[in-house]
């Protein structure tokens, strides 16, 4: 195993920077370039969790910078290996010179995510916890931070471990029955107990899988589709919500020909806004493709902002509503009446279609009138429940897919027990359920999958 080094702090100039060195030759390499302020304070002789002040030198023993070196000894470090973290001044030149000095002394530059991958390989964390490290680094809202921290601390892993241990117990008994298959009267695994266990595990896995809709919304943002006729002000509203010119705005009908997405944190909750192409009959093939994507975005949204231009014919809008009405079922709908600044409040229309349960607001996307009120309304209608520290919420697509496969396997176990299926078939489905649960924490994950997961990390992590 080679000894690796990388800058662990964010790129660019800052007050300080941290360079992490990890591997079997960490202390030998660092001692070659570290000059302690006090004699006899070489890093290889220091106790774990100590800080030593000194200098880093380069070629010809020239000082590069005065630094503080933190010592971590295996296995009690992030990677489980001997580790030194060098805190230097934040100059990019200084950082690169220290890296070059480390490389010249025997280190190599770490690959993206290699520190966390080594932590996983050395048993410091399982794969779901490693993925949570990446989520924690990328968190931009309180919800994302809370869920990533909970998963990194192992709550999800412990839940899965309990399920796997129970399944392994009964699987071993089923396998024992197969070893004594010539004695048909022998039954080591009590079928009644196994049925009770299968029902319990089915309930737990179902609950975990169902939590993904909430977890995905917290991690990637609650999907909000901005829907309306052409030139209703959808792109202008997106720009107003984001407070930037994200979408092109024009008086020409059909300007937006594709969906445009961006996220914004409102009161600690992440929303993913989707500006869609105006829905209308068209002979333009490209615009028609954009409208098709608008319908797809509408179907996937949890919240729909339905835009109505108050200066347009109400009958046209009501006809437009009839076209999309079936797609609004079970969605939170906000009817945003745009251009209220050019009409008196008394002129707001009464709609012929049912709007019970909808939220209505008069806005001006162009002048940003009542945009703050619209943002507040979005937080009120979002369906994210109040989460507690002990709640286990699935946020990762890979985990959700594995849980779905495990659920299918446990359903086959239940069906097999109800139909008195042979023990070898039931045992096979039990093993498959265990396999998919183990895949989540990385006990059976292939090198290809591991590489795909860790390459999305930053180099210094």
From Swiss-Prot:
Cofactor, free-text remark: Binds 1 potassium ion per subunit.
Record InterPro entries: G_TrmE, GTP-bd, GTP-bd_TrmE_N, GTPase_MnmE, MnmE_dom2, MnmE_helical, P-loop_NTPase, Small_GTP-bd
GO CC term, one of those recorded: cytosol
Amino acids binding (6S)-5-formyl-5,6,7,8-tetrahydrofolate: 20, 85, 124, 461
Cofactor(s) listed: K(+)
EC number(s) reported in the record: 3.6.-.-
Functional note: Exhibits a very high intrinsic GTPase hydrolysis rate. Involved in the addition of a carboxymethylaminomethyl (cmnm) group at the wobble position (U34) of certain tRNAs, forming tRNA-cmnm(5)s(2)U34.
Quaternary structure and partners: Homodimer. Heterotetramer of two MnmE and two MnmG subunits.
PANTHER family: TRNA MODIFICATION GTPASE GTPBP3 (PTHR42714), TRNA MODIFICATION GTPASE GTPBP3, MITOCHONDRIAL (PTHR42714:SF2)
Protein name: tRNA modification GTPase MnmE
Biological source species: Parabacteroides distasonis (strain ATCC 8503 / DSM 20701 / CIP 104284 / JCM 5825 / NCTC 11152)
